[in-house]
Structures are given as C-alpha cells and as structure tokens.
From Swiss-Prot:
GO terms for cellular component: host cell membrane; membrane; virion component. The chain crosses the membrane at residues 10-30. This is Tail virion protein G7P. Coiled coil: none annotated. Signal peptide: none annotated. The gene is VII. It is found in: Virion; Host membrane. It comes from Enterobacteria phage M13. Belongs to the inovirus G7P protein family. It is a single-pass membrane protein. Its main location: virion.
Length: 33
C-alpha cells in the first residue's frame, strides 16, 4: 500500500485548492471594495 504517495498527492491538491481559494477570495474582496 502506498499511503505515503496518496498522502503526498492529497497534500499537493490541498495546497493548490488553498491557493485558488485565496486568489478567489482576493478577487471577491477587491470587488466588494
């Protein structure tokens, strides 16, 4: 079982999602100004 590889993939996916969410929130905050 390659749990380490799966965890690494999930970890990278979470980082990408976090970056996208932060970018989206930045646009929303900028638009609300």
């Amino acid at each position: 079982m390659e749990q380490v590889a799966d965890f690494d993939t999930i970890y990278q996916a979470m980082i990408q999602i976090s970056v996208v969410l932060c970018f989206a929130l930045g646009i929303i905050a900028g638009g609300q100004r």
